[in-house]
Amino acid sequence: SDGDPAVVYVQDLLDDWLGAAAARVILPITDPYVVHHGALGSFATVYLPNSANAADIADRLATVDGIMMVIDRAKAVMRFELPADRIGDLVIVSNENITIGTSRDRHDLAALKEPLRSHGGLTEQEVPFIVNRQIDLPNAPKLRNFDAFHFASIAASK
């Protein structure tokens, strides 16, 4: 590693494959505060033109170094409990230590001095769940990172 941010610029790839601006890559993390993440994340959704074969594009994206997973909307809705009307045709998740960007020219990383961090990937889901009192946990099969806020709120209200 040479210290440069490890980024897969998905919009650039799709522009090369499908033509400029034919597809649209949306990164839910859009905060341009470069000290943290430079508007790069580990999760992206892609809107494809009607003429594109989503399965072929997914297969192609899945072969790109740094990409952990590419799934279609139906699978993303089930796997991540997402609203189908608010995500694109494909969902992309990057590997650990890799971020996803739209286009190289849309991410100004010149001011990046601190190590880059990311959000939204599967490798960032494990969060320590530490409490200072006993709480009644549900009979859920597995707690997830976003459950921490729910249980912290309940504990604080007592």
Question: Across the structure, where does each feature detected by a protein language model lie?
Answer:
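Feature captures the catalytic ectodomains and active-site-proximal regions of enzymes
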Residues: 1-158
